[in-house]
């Protein structure tokens, strides 16, 4: 597989074209950002940890019948993925109240949400990824009703699979975001799943083991990511 020019440079990943029109290479960098890119730092080992963590999770989801864009690891920091036509909507599933939900509704952090909630946000850094609803998605043509229904079904299936995985590792899956795209017309899970895009707390102590350690200045960010990976059995 020949790696060609950079197509896109995000806050923490770079996307490269290949000699296969249906495949891309994702490069996980050490860049760590918060507050829509207003704060950026370099954290040693982060790119490699997130690349391998993502590969582990995506393979678990594939095994559970959820189609993902992940194909294979290429190096410590690179993986081969399917080229998707991305839908500009983030799907967020919440099992416990945290983050923007707490700020938006004024509820106490850590309250269990039964059933889990499903939320939609427009992917737009300039606007701060605003909260939207299903009517917006349909009215602006970001996805069809059928595509949105499939995204919602997959989101809850991901929650079901990963809740057990993390629970067995002594962790609470507080919330997470997913992005989807189309591969030859079919809805496929894209982007990544790592501690950058979910909240994970230790089940006993409620210690934060995710990117909130960076956002809130708690320190030991990569050490927490590596501890989560170790508990799950991710080969680093």
Swiss-Prot record:
Taxonomic classification, please?
Bacteria, Pseudomonadati, Pseudomonadota, Gammaproteobacteria, Pseudomonadales
GO BP: any one term: cobalamin biosynthetic process
Q: What name does this protein carry? A: Phosphoribosylaminoimidazole-succinocarboxamide synthase
- Give EC number(s), comma-separated: 6.3.2.6
Q: In the UniProt record, does the keyword Membrane occur?
A: no
Gene Ontology cellular-component terms listed: cytosol
The answer to whether UniProt assigns keyword Ligase to this entry is: yes
Alphabetical list of InterPro entries matching this protein: SAICAR_synt/ADE2_N, SAICAR_synt_PurC, SAICAR_synth, SAICAR_synthetase, SAICAR_synthetase_CS
Q: Which GO terms describe its molecular function?
A: ATP binding; phosphoribosylaminoimidazolesuccinocarboxamide synthase activity
Q: Which domain of life is it from?
A: Bacteria
What is the gene called? purC
Recite the UniProt keywords alphabetically: ATP-binding, Ligase, Nucleotide-binding, Purine biosynthesis
**Catalytic reactions on record:** 5-amino-1-(5-phospho-D-ribosyl)imidazole-4-carboxylate + L-aspartate + ATP = (2S)-2-[5-amino-1-(5-phospho-beta-D-ribosyl)imidazole-4-carboxamido]succinate + ADP + phosphate + 2 H(+)
Q: In which pathway does it act?
A: Purine metabolism; IMP biosynthesis via de novo pathway; 5-amino-1-(5-phospho-D-ribosyl)imidazole-4-carboxamide from 5-amino-1-(5-phospho-D-ribosyl)imidazole-4-carboxylate: step 1/2
Against Gene3D superfamilies, the record matches this protein to:
ATP-grasp fold, B domain (3.30.470.20), Phosphorylase Kinase, domain 1 (3.30.200.20)
The UniProt similarity line reads: Belongs to the SAICAR synthetase family.
